[in-house]
Amino acid sequence: MPSVLWILFDGGGDRPTGGKTPFYVAFKPVIDYFTSLGSCGILDPISPGVRPGSDTAHLALFGYDPYRYYTGRGAFEALGAGVDLRPGDVAFRTNLATVDESGVVVDRRAGRYIAPEEARAVERLMASIGEEVGKAYGVEVLYRSTVEHRGVLVLRGPVSHKVSDTDPHKVGERIHMSEPLDGSKEAALTAQVVNEITRRFSAAAEGLEVNKARKASGRPPINAILLRGGGYMPQIEPVKERYKVRAAAIAGVALIRGVARAVGMDVYTAPGLGGTKDDVFDEAVKLAVELMSRYDVVFLHVKGTDSTAHDGDFRGKVSVIERLDKALSPYVDKIAGNYLVVTSDHATPVSIREHTGEPVPFLLYGPDVVTDDVGKFSELTCWRGALGRLRGIDVMPTLSSYLGLAEKFGE
């Protein structure tokens, strides 16, 4: 029985720069070959005009209405970082950041690259802060670094996710104070804990030895921590029960591993797949092809297209696409007897450097899929394809149907 290889370029969608997009410019003979043999369309990850987060977009793409199942980004980050959340736990996504002398955020990612020894130093500092704050407020505080500037903070005890973010979500502003969003004592306590952790981190981080080295080399210091997306673990029907598919996900980013884990996918990583713009895809693609013999759907997440777009790096985004395509080239014959999906979870135009709400290109190839006349995978071409305009939540039912696993609706 055939299976599906699903390649997801995070933030891969774009707007034309000089009349062309990274997908259009990229030399990607394998993807374009299957485009010439498959059906194309454009995809609204959630719905037209909605600017998706990667979390809500992946929920929709995996077949779950984000308006029903989304409970905050933090829970998925924690799951993806290997934290087993308990009922009542509240988790936050964190960014290591840089603020100036007046406390204004000048870099929400502290230069993006955080070396392993720097991440370990931050974890030691956060463990000390967590122990002190935990004793003072009667909660347990867990922190774990994930990829680059990213991390996860988990609060355990009489806490609530009903608090506001400290992350201003843009540079040029001070770190926000967390505020309770309802009148509960749990929300009030949680906001106090979040603000105290934020304050203590900023006070202590300047003294970190790794910051002295960063400053000496001209790199921005890690002197602030930003929290956002407080949430709890939702109750989600596994994808095997809902869509009858055995699914696996390969991802280097904690958030995506967490969403996949939450919907019941088996989660894998591969050498070279660290969730950065410099990822090497050969081992990840090899693993994906091997897993196709054991799973109905194998999902491969490519983060670098989003990271480069957030940095405004057009050529870097093109390079990520081309490197992934090159990694596919040894497996063309293997893929040809199965199904292939290529798409994005949202657009991150290099000219905007943020997620936007336009549709993204979509390809479905398979031995029994109608062939249209598109021939080249890009925003400028896929709109002419046979599939028309789809929603993210349509993808998994469509794949289940092609695999012969979908149940009939009615008689």
UniProtKB/Swiss-Prot annotation:
Reactions accelerated catalytically: (2R)-2-phosphoglycerate = (2R)-3-phosphoglycerate
The UniProt record lists the keyword Isomerase: yes
Superkingdom in the source lineage: Archaea
GO terms of biological process kind: glycolytic process
Molecular functions per Gene Ontology: metal ion binding; phosphoglycerate mutase activity
Enzyme class of the recorded protein, top EC level: isomerase
CDD domains, per the entry: iPGM_like
Biological function: Catalyzes the interconversion of 2-phosphoglycerate and 3-phosphoglycerate.
Protein name as it appears in the record: 2,3-bisphosphoglycerate-independent phosphoglycerate mutase
Gene for this chain: apgM
